[in-house]
Amino acid sequence: MSSGSLGQGISAAVGMAITAKLSGDDYRVYTLVGDGEIQEGQVWEASMLAAHRKLDNLVVIVDNNNLQIDGAITEVNSPYPIDKKFEAFNFHVINIDGNDFDQIDAAFKEAKTVKGQPTAIIAKTVKGKGVSFMENQVGWHGKAPNDEEYKIAMEELEKAGEALCQK
């Protein structure tokens, strides 16, 4: 589902996780939030409820790239340290390099073993990773490349994908 306005995705995910618990279903709910998005109070209200309800079927992935539409997170309204905030809300926290597929895989496997509390995976990422002119550039937030930029980006991503397949 589209999460709508900032902060609403985690609230919907908490509702889905509660529904699974109440209905006796064993599915897991995953939601992705940005480090800019977690400045929204609704995120922390939902997190508090998730921990209170011991939603061990909920995994919150935080895309921690230090950039949001208005600029660097640290210059706009810093939520750091993100991991400590989720720990304070009684989440099991896993810090990873969000651009490392092996670490991502390991984090999801670990999250499945957690009992009695929700999990937050704090994924340190590079915005625009793999495209030289987009990496760590806040100006690409919500902006589409032109035809030439698209061609260059796809060539760079294809090379990166080939390198991953050879790993």
Where are these regions (language model features)?
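Glycine-rich ThDP/TPP pyrophosphate-binding loop and its adjacent helix/strand module
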Residues: 1-167
